[in-house]
A protein has these predicted regions:
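Short, flexible, basic/aromatic active-site loop/helix in glycosyltransferases
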Residues: 132-133, 146-165
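Non-catalytic, C-terminal membrane-associated alpha-helical segments of glycosyltransferases
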Residues: 231-237, 251-302
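Short aromatic/hydrophobic "clamp" motif used to bind/position activated sugar donors
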Residues: 100
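Acidic donor-binding loop at a coil-to-helix junction in glycosyltransferase catalytic cores
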Residues: 191-200
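Short, well-formed alpha-helical segments that are part of the catalytic scaffolds
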Residues: 5, 28-41
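Acidic donor-binding segment of Leloir-type glycosyltransferases
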Residues: 36-78
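Glycine-rich, basic loop-to-helix element that forms the pyrophosphate-binding segment
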Residues: 79-95
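Conserved donor NDP-sugar-binding/catalytic core segment of glycosyltransferases
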Residues: 112-143
Length: 302
């Protein structure tokens, strides 16, 4: 079904925005509210619209979403549950902005995020892809572990030329001109790790994303540690389909054991530098070990 603005406000100019912020939602309405609040803080920056794709949630968008159209343009489109890749492609096809920005429902743009991103994009007219800097929410153990993981991961994968061998659609931007006319940027076969599959394509094309450290997005995990572990098991299983495609293309994208050890060492040092304590290190390494175990089991069985 076509996207329809929830509430039309005649005071909002209907011009082509610079950014289209695309969020795919599947039963994440509570988390989305925090994302919307963070976007309301970006209204003094570059023009943007928001496109929310409801990927067949049990309940339709709550009425509280409607109020945001009085602050910035927002459209909601609903589809049958088809997965994150198809949902994001639907968002692309619905959007009108010159630059597509992907965030997750449980992510919150920090103050000045879009302004910093536009400045970087405007200063690099030959570049097409941009990775925003991701941080965790240090309010609890799960958030501190995520903060630690992201610090070490982005530090390790950042290259001297300002590019990063990392792509996470919790905060990723791409020029519309780089996307095919049909709007199918993400491979629909990928139920999970669709962003890693896109990164493999960029690696093959020799076009790694430009890192934008000033444009910050906070990943606000709503799950408990037990919930995260259950999600890790599911994700590791479904991600294998994407990694099988990557391997078939002959692109080396997965981390080596040397990379893993380097990141673990970097995380250990970062626990003191970021004043996070040592316990988050054990949480991150435990979660990564679980994912690796499930992934290895998948390979053996298939």
């Amino acid at each position: 079904m076509p996207a329809v603005p929830i509430v039309k406000d005649q005071n909002i100019p209907h011009t082509i925005p610079f950014f289209s912020v695309i969020v795919a939602v599947y039963n994440d309405w509570l988390a989305l509210d925090g994302c919307l609040q963070s976007l309301a803080q970006q209204t003094d920056g570059p023009s943007f619209e928001m496109v929310v794709v409801d990927d067949g949630s049990r309940e339709q968008a709550p009425e509280t979403v409607a109020k945001w159209n009085r602050i910035f343009p927002i459209s909601v489109v609903r589809q049958e549950h088809a997965g994150i890749s198809i949902a994001r492609n639907k968002g692309i096809q619905t959007s009108t902005g010159s630059v597509l920005v992907f965030v997750d429902a449980d992510c919150r743009m920090q103050q000045g995020c879009l302004a910093a991103l536009k400045q970087k994009i405007s200063g690099a007219p030959a570049e097409n892809c941009f990775q925003l800097r991701l941080i965790g929410n240090p309010a609890d153990l799960v958030g501190r572990a995520e903060q630690l993981r992201l610090i070490a991961l982005q530090r390790h994968l950042l290259q001297p030329n300002g590019r990063i061998r990392y792509l996470n659609t919790a905060g990723f931007a791409i020029r519309r001109s780089k996307v095919s006319e049909d709007g199918n940027l993400f491979n629909p076969i990928a139920v999970r790790a669709e962003d890693t599959l896109l990164l493999a394509t960029l690696v093959r094309l020799g076009e790694l994303p430009i890192f934008v450290p000033e444009a910050v997005v906070q990943h606000h995990i709503c799950l408990s540690l037990a919930g995260c572990l259950r999600k890790d098991v599911r994700s590791a299983y479904f991600e294998r389909r994407a990694f099988d495609i990557i391997e078939a293309r002959g692109v080396a994208i997965q981390m080596t054991n040397q990379d893993r050890w380097a990141i673990m060492s970097s995380m250990w040092r970062a626990t003191d530098q970021a004043a996070l304590g040592k316990l988050p290190w054990f949480v991150v390494t435990g979660r990564q070990a679980l994912r690796l175990l499930v992934s290895t089991g998948y390979r053996i069985l298939h």
